[in-house]
Amino acid sequence: MTEGAPGPVQGPAPGETPDRAGEPMGKAVVFALAAAAGLTVANIYYNQPMLGLMERGLSGHAVTYVPTVTQLGYAAGLLVLVPLGDLVERKRLIVLQCLALTFALALVAAAPSAGLVLCASLVVGLLASVAQQIVPFAANLAPDDRRGAVVGTVMAGLLCGILLSRTLAGIVAGLLGWREMFWLAVPLALATTGLMALMLPRSRPRPTDMSYGGLLASLWSLWREFPALRRAAYVQCCQFGVFSVFWTILALRLEEPRFGLGPEAAGLFGILGAAGVLAAPIAGRIADRRGPRRVIVMASVLTLASWLVFALWQSIAGLVVGIVVMDFAVQASQVSNQSIIYALRPEARSRINTVYMAIMFLAGAACSGTATAVWHGWGWSGVTVLGIAISVLGVALQGLRRG
């Protein structure tokens, strides 16, 4: 098999699974994929509850842009690494990317300056995009009538990683320091590498004559071909945008004299997002039975409601209620939109997922960076105005879809 042009598939070798929908997959594999998705995506969120500590430990405001840089790296990984999932053997790709992520995390932990932390964080984001190799792999292995539920389970694992990463980072940073948290992430990434090497079936991509360059060029063609992909991406840009705005600023908000809370509290708030974990499989099952569009409309309205709560109920109780509603809505929308895009062209799922997720994370990075600038200029009031404006746009997009 030549590089970039796999030959015809003669059938799976022992231990191999053809990379196509409908093949049976055991629960152990589903849960391994869910765990790996959570453990890998966690690495782009460890920094959020620790921003206050990092800002004090490294001079200047530059370090407060670590979440933005990390998300930019993640978006870059989606564009240049995730498309390989349609071209090369997925198990090997996932294992190698997890292993490289281990070394990138060590670079962040050891970086002596804000500039080097930013550079190393960019690499962490790039390699953590392996989480988006895992999600379409699960979709490809799942039978058609279980795809929504399987994707929902894997996405629940991914969301657990997002939520628990903040909790773990907040507690560890509060007790030991932010560098120690990144050092702890190193063996966690190494354990993920071992889990994937042990549990994943080998697979072969569908036969194709497309080179890697052609694969990347095809992303634009897929974007133009499928209006449903564009609609899903636009809607989720708004959802993930406000999600990024909130979690980027939360630790800084809690450190204000009004609350006087440290990274441990910021991390514990992450547990409240468990509502999103519940939303993932529920939304997947509803999408399978009644169609995903109803779920997406409901989620857009709930997201706007959560930001009205943040703006009007400025207390710990208001933050609690808003987080539960927002995380439930964002995750329900995500699972439903992915249910739509994964049905468009099965042999191009990795590339379709690349387009969708790259645009979503570029929007997240832009909103995160904007939120940081707004915070330094106008404080929490400015941030809530930003969140409400983006949420209103998300609701307006539902009206355009219906029209």
Whereabouts are the PLM-identified features?
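Helix-to-loop junctions at the C-terminal end of transmembrane segments
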Residues: 78-89, 278-291, 375
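Helix-loop-helix hairpin linking two adjacent transmembrane segments in secondary transporters
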Residues: 153-200
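Conserved MFS/SLC helix-loop-helix module at the cytosolic interface between two early adjacent transmembrane helices
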Residues: 76-114
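C-terminal transmembrane helical hairpin of 12-TM major facilitator-type secondary transporters
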Residues: 293-337
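Cytoplasmic helix-loop-helix junction between adjacent transmembrane helices
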Residues: 120-158
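Juxtamembrane intracellular "pre-TM" segments in multi-pass secondary transporters
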Residues: 15-23, 201-234
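Intracellular juxtamembrane helix-capping segments at the cytosolic ends
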Residues: 130-142, 332-345
